[in-house]
Amino acid sequence: MKKIIKLSLLSLSIAGLASCSTLGLGGSDDAKASAKDTAAAQTATTEQAAAVSKPTAKVSLNKLGQDKIKATVYTAYNNNPQGSVRLQWQAPEGSKCHDTSFPITKYAEKNDKTWATVTVKQGNNFCSGKWTANVVYDKEVIASDSINI
């Protein structure tokens, strides 16, 4: 019985001390300032994590045979999600050919290499002129290359 009473008193003492420390009773001003600094640091870290830098890319175009163009794209995603970077093909002006755009599949975070082709003959129409491939992130062109066909 005495052991139970002693354990109960010890438990109450520990609970009382713990409540004082969480309520800020009896603590020093340094401890309060430290808690504020910790909260500010956590907020700053959260804001930095939310502010992801935009990806970087390089694109180069080569002619393949009579009617294809190949775009080789190197991308550093900088922690941006899959589908955030797009490849946009611009057909020559006045050629009556279609522009296309699609997301680039992310295989690696840095130095991700991918490629895509476009056919310069659409139906009976041969789309001669200046073809441009743009790498786009958040409606901003981050890399571009052109070739004359």
UniProtKB/Swiss-Prot annotation:
It is a lipid-anchor. A lipid is attached at C20 (N-palmitoyl cysteine). Residues 1-19 form the signal peptide. Keywords: Cell outer membrane, Lipoprotein, Membrane, Palmitate, Signal. It is found in: Cell outer membrane. Its main location: membrane. GO terms for cellular component: cell outer membrane. A lipid is attached at C20 (S-diacylglycerol cysteine). This is 17 kDa major membrane protein.
